[in-house]
Amino acid sequence: MCGIIGYVGADEVVPVILDGLRRLEYRGYDSAGMAVLAPDTIQILRAEGKLRNLEQLAYHHPLHGTTGVGHTRWATHGAPTEANAHPQIDTNGEIAVVHNGILENYASLRRELLDDGVELSSDTDTELIAQLLGREDGPLGDRVIKILPRLVGQYAVVAVSRSEPDTVVAFRQGPPLVVGLGTGENIVASDVTAILHRTRNVIYLQNGEIAVVRADRVELLRVDGTTVDRSPETLDWDAGRVEKGGYRHFMLKEIFEQPDAIRNTVLAYLDQDRQGVNLDGLGFSSEELARLRRVHLVACGTSWHACLVGKFVIEELTGLPTEVDYASEYRYREPLIGEDVLVVGVTQSGETADTLAAMEMAGAGGALLATVCNVRGSSAWRLATSHMLTPVSYTH
């Protein structure tokens, strides 16, 4: 998954972008880049390989401005080269775009643009978004609304326009984006780890939403142009949760934190006298729980491994047959779903795309939805009726 950061405010944007990208390095990447708005132009720096290569480039070719976007890329469409790194720009240098996801109609859009005489400079699907935006008129937010019906796939996009040097526009369908609300500044990122050191007030974008972000305000829009009214959330995390805390890397930190992580998770659901488990706040009625006949656990990666253990515990304690599915396969095996099934999505971030898709399908089939996750307010959190928050350090 790519890392995305966008900033508009009073500070020089290059240090903000580089710091945000460092905090997103755990995602893995093969190139990095940034776009900085200057009077009547967009300044672009891109580099193959590690983030330090981009840092060196920025040192030798300093950029100045207070609005910009940055990106770490894991190649999907196009080889991991400088030309395919993000940001991608349109032919006229009007629009710069960073993108996480995959456009499924990439081939048809590319052919259409080539047939119209557009000269493409990369092999990426991201450039197609920039070119489509560049062919529209009006403010950047309006341009986004015009092209959204043409985008098929999963995407999180942050864009800037040289005509609007005080604006960053973000939109998503699938991969997560979060807006951080500061004082005289606002930030967009693919993960709160990139912004938590600057603000704890955030708005999580939902699928199909557009955020028009300026230094003094954020406007949320639907795809039809109507306004979304949503109050920000205040994260109660200790900023140290997303730092290495003196460890050489996050993996080592997480290993040493496991005893406390298990203890804190268990204590959160014990009665005050520690003689029993209190699940009163899980959100299901007694009638809903009484009619359950099966449990489905859906997850990916190491969350799936945890579900394999959870299956034995659930069956032992409840007597309910419990199935464990890799979330990416769950949608394709036609599982038996109904009101007597509890589907639990297990996802650390609450944003794992396949797990979310499995939960959405199960909910549409009438199943009860629960989630075990680490991020209050995440997509999985909002999908589920019942939530079990793991009160542990932020994991990578």
Task: Place the predicted regions along the sequence by residue.
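Conserved small/polar residues in nucleotide/adenosyl-binding loops
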Residues: 395-396
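Short glycine/serine/threonine-rich phosphate/pyrophosphate-binding segments
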Residues: 303-309, 351-358, 380
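Conserved short alpha-helical segments that host acidic/polar catalytic motifs at enzyme active sites
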Residues: 1-249, 253, 257, 263-296
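N-terminal small/polar loop signature for handling phosphorylated ligands or for N-terminal nucleophile
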Residues: 129, 331-347, 353-354, 363
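Glycine-rich, charge-decorated loop segments at or immediately adjacent to ligand/cofactor-binding or catalytic sites
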Residues: 376-384
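Short acidic loop-to-helix transition motifs that present clustered carboxylates
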Residues: 128, 152-153, 195, 281, ...
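Short, solvent-exposed amphipathic alpha-helical segments in soluble enzyme
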Residues: 20-24, 173-176, 204, 310-316, ...
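Anionic-ligand anchoring segments at beta-strand to alpha-helix junctions in alpha/beta enzyme folds, i.e.
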Residues: 176, 263, 267-269, 273-276, ...
